[in-house]
Amino acid sequence: MESPIAAILETALYVDDLDAAEAFYGGVLRLEKISRAGDRHIFFRCGPGVLLIFNPDETEKPAAADALPVPAHGGRGQGHVCFRLKDNDFAAMLDRLNENGIATESDFLWPNGARSIYFRDPAGNSLECAEGKLWGL
């Protein structure tokens, strides 16, 4: 039987400083901000999906009685997300990182020839940019 799941719609990272995250993801990475709810979360459009940035101090709390029944959740420590670059444009991405003083931790080719670069957001989350062919896309 084939899986009924079509794709990942959203993925989440957790940060302690939403202002720093907003400046990084909106300013440095130039993702389109969808919405922000105070010090609880900020959401960004990322291609056909959504990147959710949460403050775990807020999302670990149970939902208010008058709120949607989203279960409490939270993560501590460094997470990871990998972005697929438009047109495999590593030069443009590296320029953006360099212009903003963001260090590249690693830049290499996988055994199948796909390239990946790794760097960190202000919260210490591990971010990767890779070619779709890494996963046969």
Could you describe each region identified by the protein language model?
Residues 15-18, 111:
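Conserved beta-strand-loop-alpha-helix junction that forms the acyl-donor binding cleft
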Residues 13-16, 85-87:
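Short, surface-exposed ligand-recognition loops at beta-strand->loop->(often short) alpha-helix junctions
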Residues 21-28, 97, 124:
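Conserved active-site tyrosine of GNAT-family acetyltransferases
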